[in-house]
A protein has these predicted regions:
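Immediate flanking context of iron-sulfur cluster ligation sites
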Residues: 154-175
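ATP-dependent adenylation/nucleotidyltransferase module used to activate substrates
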Residues: 1-156
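Iron-sulfur (Fe-S) cluster-binding segments and ferredoxin-like electron-carrier domains
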Residues: 172-197
C-alpha cells in the first residue's frame, strides 16, 4: 500500500477446499480495514486432486519425517495461486504480484523457495507475453524477522490480532499444530531479541 498506493492494490484469497474458512474471514477483515479491494478466487477442484491434511479434515496433521514434506503440503498450490493471480492481473492491467512465502522456516515446501518464485516469474512472463514481476518480501525472513518487520511497520499488535495461521482453524490458535508452534516460537524469539537489545 505504501509503495503502490491503496487504489493500486488488490488482495486475493483462494478457496481451494481447505478444511476451514477462518483464513478467508481474516483476509476479508484485513482488506476492509486496510481499505483495499479484495477478490476471492475459487479453485475447489484442487482438493479433489491432492490428498493432504489441509483439504482433508479426516487426516490428522503430521510433520514430515526423514526429509519428507509434512502432510499439509498441497502440491502445486502456490503455482496455481500465482497463475490465477497473473491471469486476473492481466485483466486489470497489473504486472506485479506480491506473495507472502518464506523458505526460511519449517518445512521447506518446494513452492516457497526462491528458485520456484524466479521460475514462475519467467514462466508467467512467457505465458502472458509480457514481463511479470513477482515480489516475495518475506522470502528469506524467519518468523522472528517477520514479526520484527510487522513491528517496524507499526503493525505488530494488529498483525497478531488479525492474521491467521492455525491449520485447524482455531481463531486464537490451537497451540498444537506445526503452524501455531512456528508462529508462537517466532513471536517469542522476536520478543526475546527485543528484550536483549
Amino acid at each position: 500500500i505504501h509503495d503502490y498506493g491503496r487504489d493500486q492494490v488488490v488482495a486475493l484469497s483462494f478457496v481451494y477446499g481447505q478444511r476451514h474458512s477462518i483464513e478467508l474471514e481474516a483476509a476479508k477483515k484485513m482488506a476492509a480495514t486496510l481499505r483495499v479491494s479484495h477478490k476471492i478466487i475459487f479453485l475447489n477442484t484442487l482438493a479433489e486432486l491432492s490428498d493432504n491434511a489441509l483439504t482433508n479434515s479426516e487426516k490428522s496433521i503430521q510433520s514430515g519425517e526423514n526429509g519428507s514434506y509434512p502432510n499439509t503440503f498441497v502440491p502445486g498450490r502456490n503455482a496455481l495461486f500465482l497463475l490465477y493471480a497473473a491471469i486476473y492481473g492481466d485483466t486489470i492491467g497489473a504486472r506485479r504480484l506480491v506473495i507472502g512465502v518464506s523458505e526460511a522456516d519449517f518445512s521447506g515446501y518446494p513452492d516457497c523457495r526462491a528458485d520456484f518464485i524466479f521460475s514462475m516469474e519467467e514462466t508467467l512472463s512467457l505465458a502472458l507475453g509480457k514481463k511479470i514481476i513477482i515480489e516475495a518480501p518475506l522470502q528469506y525472513l524467519n518468523k522472528a524477522e517477520i514479526w520484527g518487520l510487522a513491528d517496524a511497520l507499526g503493525a505488530l499488535d494488529w498483525v497478531e490480532e488479525n492474521s491467521h495461521t492455525c491449520y485447524l482453524g482455531v481463531k486464537e490458535g490451537c497451540h498444537e499444530c506445526p503452524a501455531c508452534h512456528l508462529r508462537e516460537e517466532g513471536l517469542k524469539r522476536y520478543r526475546a531479541l527485543q528484550q536483549e537489545s
